[in-house]
Amino acid sequence: MAVMTGANTAGVDKEVATQALNAELQDKGFLLTSTEDIINWARTGSLHWMTFGLACCAVEMMHTSMPRYDAERFGIAPRASPRQSDVMIVAGTLTNKMAPALRKVYDQMPEPRYVISMGSCANGGGYYHYSYSVVRGCDRIVPVDIYVPGCPPTAEALLYGLLQLQRKIRRTGTIVR
């Protein structure tokens, strides 16, 4: 990772001098990077997720944190309180009565906060899409970062979605809404 500085006057290609300096310092056990990159690296390695299980997808969501899949080896651990969570996983059918509660819990989460929509019902209403009491996708209530398809999606699919969220955070930094 190269660092651009204002004092770097290596001609047209300023990256050449910076890369040489980085290589020399790495040989001696030092690393040059930006603070934002370190914060994003730490954020992806310590995601705390909160479950918002509404229907059958919640069973698969519970499987993800069990020993067979062991999400904690990726730095992803469950939390019970929205005030300690970075990620909310919405799994299942979201009804009109439950939508204000979902928004309230989302608002209690600290910034930056991320949402994963898990399953067909959370993504777009699923089997109950035309019901009068169902919200046709939780993205109408809260902004969604990752969609995990399936009815119900497997624990592997949710784990893949969590890893994709980590990738998205590393690639884009803090997601500005």
Curated annotation (Swiss-Prot):
Annotated SUPFAM superfamilies: HydA/Nqo6-like (SSF56770)
Gene Ontology MF term list: 4 iron, 4 sulfur cluster binding; iron ion binding; NADH dehydrogenase (ubiquinone) activity; NADH:ubiquinone reductase (non-electrogenic) activity; quinone binding
Catalysis: reaction(s): a quinone + NADH + 5 H(+)(in) = a quinol + NAD(+) + 4 H(+)(out)
Annotated positions binding [4Fe-4S] cluster: C56, C57, C121, C151
Pfam family of the protein (one): Oxidored_q6
Entry keyword Membrane: yes
PROSITE patterns, per database record: COMPLEX1_20K
One Gene Ontology cellular component annotation held by this UniProt entry: plasma membrane
Keyword line: 4Fe-4S, Cell inner membrane, Cell membrane, Iron, Iron-sulfur, Membrane, Metal-binding, NAD, Quinone, Translocase, Transport, Ubiquinone
Disulfide bonds: none
EC class name: translocase
Subcellular location: Cell inner membrane
EC number: 7.1.1.-
Cofactor(s) it depends on: [4Fe-4S] cluster
GO terms under biological process: aerobic respiration; electron transport coupled proton transport
Main location: membrane
Membrane topology reported for the UniProt record: Peripheral membrane protein
Bound cofactor: record note: Binds 1 [4Fe-4S] cluster.
Coiled coil: none
Known partners and oligomeric status: NDH-1 is composed of 14 different subunits. Subunits NuoB, C, D, E, F, and G constitute the peripheral sector of the complex.
Membership in a protein family: Belongs to the complex I 20 kDa subunit family.
PANTHER family: NADH DEHYDROGENASE, NADH DEHYDROGENASE [UBIQUINONE] IRON-SULFUR PROTEIN 7, MITOCHONDRIAL
Function: NDH-1 shuttles electrons from NADH, via FMN and iron-sulfur (Fe-S) centers, to quinones in the respiratory chain. Couples the redox reaction to proton translocation (for every two electrons transferred, four hydrogen ions are translocated across the cytoplasmic membrane), and thus conserves the redox energy in a proton gradient.
The protein's name: NADH-quinone oxidoreductase subunit B
Organism: Ruegeria pomeroyi (strain ATCC 700808 / DSM 15171 / DSS-3) (Silicibacter pomeroyi)
Native organism taxonomy: Bacteria, Pseudomonadati, Pseudomonadota, Alphaproteobacteria, Rhodobacterales
